[in-house]
Amino acid sequence: MEKKAKLMIVAGESSGELYGSLIAHYLKNDFDLIGIGGKYMADAGVKLIGEVTHAFGAFEAISKIKKLKENMKKANEALQNVEGVILIDFPDFNLNLAQKAKKLGKKVLYYVSPQIWAWRKKRIKKIKKVVDFMAVVLPFEEEIYKKEKIPVEFVGHPMFEVMKQELGLYIKNESLSLDNKRHIRDKFGIKKETVITLMPGSRPSEIKRKIPLMLNLVEKFDKSKTHFIIPKAPNIDLSEQFLKQITTKENVTVLNEKSFIALAMSDVAVITSGTSTLQSAIVQTPMIVVYRLSPLSYLIGKTIIKGVKHIALPNVIADFMNLDDVRIPEFIQKLDAEEIAEEINKMLYDEYYREKIITFLGNIKRYFTEKEASREVYKICKKLFC
């Protein structure tokens, strides 16, 4: 029996670890797999040599630095005995590892591109030197790498796979249509006429800055008709202070489910910028993006982030792909509950405006429904590593 080639999959965060597990399900029959990840990857057949870290506070950050050094040491040692590496996001760590892999003559596949289109654009020069193939998850990224003559393919986004699999538990089929909202609400006993999801972020610092806004928004709507959902996935650290204040409201549910379950049953969502904006686009739930940094962080961000007009991923995609559509409203730094409540009401009750937003989200969604990212990455691996 022919010995299988050995590959190393390296993820640095919980999302990357999940994406790594999805491709491992395809790869495990053709390759021996080792890697840095977590439970998802281990369950998918990857022999772990290191684990991802989850750090929020200052003390945890010190622990994280130590863990990263340990993981880099283990990964460097493992490089000697693998045919190639699959690096998932986490660029500061993974681009350094790619450089070491390249020196050893190992093939390098990079999955989920660094956001070079927004900041630290010069990283593309390093990528060109140390990466053999880029598997990108946003449609406009493909052209960026092609211009630099870097082998690349837009593979779709693995988040769509996850959503399609899990929403099947709550709807009659795997369609992600708007008609399924009522069915999902029934599963959770939510009977109100209007459902709004509030997503204050995943980190304590983000959540702290959004608490006043979220509490004010709840007060601005008729509690007999409107129900608010706050998703609390395992990787979201909602503070005790926030939970105490928000759970006293009779028309608020803190839902211990992944955020896209809440988004799928909602009429409107108020979201901190991030992957959740893409989730909302995929289920075509109109959204408002709210974003607030500390004044210093905002000033630094304005200095280093160049070439993008928006922060919400659906808007960024639309800008790069030159879509002639409406854009999702973004409230940055100035988070006025009155203005945001007005925008929510417009999305709920102005039928023309609501339909324009839903159509726009449908146009974004189409980029992701035609490809299964993990299967596409598997095909690339078969060509690159065999």
Which residues are covered by each model-predicted region?
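Nucleotide-activated sugar donor-binding and catalytic core shared by glycosyltransferases
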Residues: 1-386
